[in-house]
Design a protein with these regions (language model features):
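ER-lumen resident redox/N-glycosylation machinery signature
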Residues: 1-395
Length: 395
């Protein structure tokens, strides 16, 4: 940190020696370092033991392990995606490059379209809207790519009522930002930066909480059975056919259920359907079997009109329950992977509690004895006075 140049770009992994997930990431981290070096990338790759370099970890606000952060021109970017080589490399290429990438030809535009499921594009000359767009890009570059182009580069089917404009291309179509209708630009981009239907993992689902939309999920196994395939195709069909009606919904399927298990605080049934409201940590479950498209549409209608109760939430009681559940799940995981550490984490607070109880119990008789002594001391003069023989009077 003291010797780096102002233009240096670093991606750093913060780890703890006892963290099993950090150890699993080690070979991936070495591959990333080797590949970036062979490509001549300006990004330097490093790692830091957060338990030893506590000052550096505090400066980067490391709260969990492994933490992956990027430092570019004094700005720190936190990576919250899957701990895979492809995911991290995409993050590096996105953040290390320009905030807004200019597409100067039809060929470049088509190439970008083929690589990205969602494309945000600014069209027009310099304007206040472009300034806002660039400011949003600086904050949200960790999540998605930002592009700019001239009108003649766009497909001829794209109709723009006026310039400048911001568009999002996804799901085989496009939408144009309208400030009066869509409100704040950043909030609109957060809502629209995901495909309408796609495979969702726990990292993506967590990030979707900022969109403010409900998420319809088909929970399936990795080796999807016939029933799971039926749920997936049902959700995908409704997502495509009723996109305009359910603009406040995202649709997808999940093959990993740890996040949902934590949300409902229990084991989930697979395959099944669930609608989650990530802004309040709530969820909705169908009241019966969902076998047809009409059943799914009735379920979504019940979610919107309030006839189906929202479970969970982020109230105080729910937060306490979820904290207890997460603590138990963490201790179970740690105990299975590091038994000695798990025993210490369980026994240490119990030992402290036992010591406090012992001290309290020991203090009680001492206080009682003191009180008795004080009482005797107060009574003794009175008894002494009462038993004292009367003095005789003499002339």
């Amino acid at each position: 940190m003291e010797s780096r140049a102002a233009d240096d770009i670093w991606i750093i992994k913060f780890y703890a020696p006892w963290c099993s997930l950090c150890k699993q990431l080690d070979p991936v981290w070495r591959q990333i370092g080797s590949e970036l070096k062979s490509l001549g990338s300006p990004v330097s790759v490093g790692k830091s033991d957060a338990t030893a370099s506590t000052g550096l970890a505090k400066e980067f606000r490391v709260r969990g392990y492994p933490a992956i952060l990027m430092l570019k021109k004094g700005v720190k970017y936190n990576y919250s995606g899957p701990r895979t080589k492809d995911g991290i490399m995409d993050f590096v290429n996105r953040v290390a490059g320009p905030l807004v990438r200019h597409l100067s030809s039809v060929q470049l535009f088509q190439h970008a379209m083929s690589r990205h499921d969602v494309m945000l594009v600014y069209v027009g000359a310099t304007s206040q809207l472009k300034g806002n767009y660039t400011s949003v890009a600086e904050e949200l570059i960790v999540h998605t790519y930002f592009f700019s182009a001239t009108r003649d580069v766009l497909p001829k089917a794209v109709s723009l009522p006026s310039l400048p404009a911001v568009l999002v291309f996804k799901d085989g179509t496009y939408f144009t930002y309208n400030e009066e209708r869509d409100g704040d630009l950043k909030l609109w981009i957060n809502r629209e930066r995901f495909p309408n239907y796609f495979r969702i993992d726990s990292y993506t689902l967590y990030a979707m909480g900022e969109s403010g939309k409900l998420v319809v999920l088909a929970l399936v196994d990795k080796n999807t059975c016939k029933e799971g395939l039926r749920y997936k195709s049902l959700v995908e069909k409704v997502a495509a056919d009723y996109r305009e009606i359910y603009r406040n919904f995202y649709f997808g399927f999940m093959e990993e259920h740890d996040y949902i298990s934590g949300l409902v605080m229990g084991e989930v049934i697979v395959p099944s359907l669930i609608v989650v409201n990530l802004s309040i940590d709530g969820y909705f479950l169908p009241q019966g079997d969902v076998e047809t498209e009409r059943h799914l549409l009735d379920f979504l209608k019940g979610v919107l009109d309030g006839s189906i109760q929202c479970l969970g939430g982020n109230g105080i009681i729910q937060r306490i329950k979820r904290f207890v559940y997460d603590t138990k799940a963490t201790l179970t995981l740690v105990s299975s992977q590091a038994p000695l550490l798990g025993c210490f984490l369980v026994s240490f607070p119990l030992a402290i509690f036992a010591i406090l109880c012992y001290l309290c119990c020991k203090a009680r008789p001492t206080m009682s004895n003191d009180d008795d002594d004080d009482g005797v001391a107060l009574l003794a003069p009175s008894l002494h006075h009462r038993n004292k023989p009367p003095q005789k009077k003499y002339d």
